[in-house]
Curated annotation (Swiss-Prot):
The gene is ATP5MJ. Subunit j, of the mitochondrial membrane ATP synthase complex (F(1)F(0) ATP synthase or Complex V) that produces ATP from ADP in the presence of a proton gradient across the membrane which is generated by electron transport complexes of the respiratory chain. ATP synthase complex consist of a soluble F(1) head domain - the catalytic core - and a membrane F(1) domain - the membrane proton channel. These two domains are linked by a central stalk rotating inside the F(1) region and a stationary peripheral stalk. The keyword Mitochondrion applies. Keywords: Membrane, Mitochondrion, Transmembrane, Transmembrane helix. One of its GO terms (biological process) is proton motive force-driven ATP synthesis. This is ATP synthase F(0) complex subunit j, mitochondrial. The keyword Transmembrane applies. InterPro entries: ATP5MJ. GO terms for cellular component: fibrillar center; mitochondrial inner membrane; mitochondrion; proton-transporting ATP synthase complex.
Length: 58
């Protein structure tokens, strides 16, 4: 169902989107990648803090 809707919209719009919005797609991809990297780094730092002894306990 959803795939047919995507195909019906995407196929006629594809040349327009690929030409006009190429820069936007690249920008969105980069933003998504950066956000993913930040989240991954945040998770890693939280995991390190959780595994490290709590402050005040020497």
């Amino acid at each position: 169902m959803l795939q047919s809707i995507i195909k019906n919209i995407w196929i006629p719009m594809k040349p327009y989107y690929t030409k006009v919005y190429q820069e936007i797609w690249i920008g969105m991809g980069l933003m998504g990648f950066i956000v993913y990297k930040i989240r991954a780094a945040d998770k890693r730092s939280k995991a390190l803090k959780a595994s490290a002894p709590a402050p005040g306990h020497h």
